[in-house]
Amino acid sequence: MAEAFSNSITRTVGVCTGYSGSTIGAAGTTITVSASTGIGVSDMVFNQNFVGGTKVTQIEGTTIYTDTASTNEAAASSQVVKFLGPTTCYSSAAATKSILIGGTLTNNENGAIKVFVETRDASAGVDANLVYNAPIPEGSSMIISDAGKTVLEATDELRVYCDTKNGVDINFSILSGVS
């Protein structure tokens, strides 16, 4: 496969479910919510009591289990917890590599939003933050370019989360077919 430059464009990214009145166990991996509608396994947990990139691993009724323990030392009640669903904006083709050259994330909303970009290493089964909790003001964009180039191996993914439903448009510049 010959190397080729392309753009991966994804419109209106942002899947967000929030519950107020949630309870977070002390240094634990459970969150109790009033309902679990709209929450999915692999959703990112967005709350001050969890480290960046914490994911939902299991849902049993109104109990949500996470892959990382909370940082609070005592149970925290009356918490607002957001669950951000992933949008896969690019997948590297099988048997080849791709390179993320840069990207533009554009705010679609009438207020500020926060965005998260992660890489999914398919062969290792690991997610890593490329951008975490970055604010984009109303009427603005964020550019990914100064951090160097990100190599994506076969079937690796670029996933984007936004704290606002349909809040961001994505345009990634990709060099694909790299051997």
Model-inferred region functions:
Residues N49-T54, G148-V151, T164-N166:
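Short, charged beta-turn/beta-strand-edge "cap" motif at the junction between a beta-strand
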